[in-house]
Amino acid sequence: MDIKVVKGSITEVDADVIVNPANSRGLMGGGVAVVIKRLGGEEIEREAVEKAPIPVGSAVLTTAGKLKFKGVIHAPTMEEPAMPSSEEKVRKATRAALELADKECFKIVAIPGMGTGVGGVPKEVAARAMVEEIRKFEPKCLEKVILVDIDEEMVEAWEKVLGLR
């Protein structure tokens, strides 16, 4: 599977679906979620909350609202909003997002740094965990993962793990 690293906003990449590193309640009050909700609309959060609780290690698909994507995958990296995350939760969330994207037969999924914002997971740790999970994953439909973040350190961490630096 092709892995591409992009510095920029997840809302501007060319992908079929984007991933929101969520909390189990589906509330979109921090980090990447705020941007997705602000640009895509309240209906994204409403639908995520309706599908809650979303356990860490699972994921749900919602509308992308006004965004150009076919949907938003909410993959919790924490149970409650602003709760600390962990490497294991990052792994589980990444795997759950990939599984759902593949099950829905999306070709390209964009994933931001998982658990690195309010979750507090060090970027290098999250980058390694995410890339390892992506490399282990055996897709049926999914062809490409775009790792995208506005944070230069996150982008550098992915590039380092992927041997691009």
From Swiss-Prot:
SMART domains: A1pp. It holds the Pfam family Macro. It comes from Aquifex aeolicus (strain VF5). This is Uncharacterized protein aq_987. Residues 1-165 form the Macro domain. PANTHER family: GANGLIOSIDE INDUCED DIFFERENTIATION ASSOCIATED PROTEIN 2-RELATED (PTHR11106), MACRO DOMAIN-CONTAINING PROTEIN (PTHR11106:SF111).
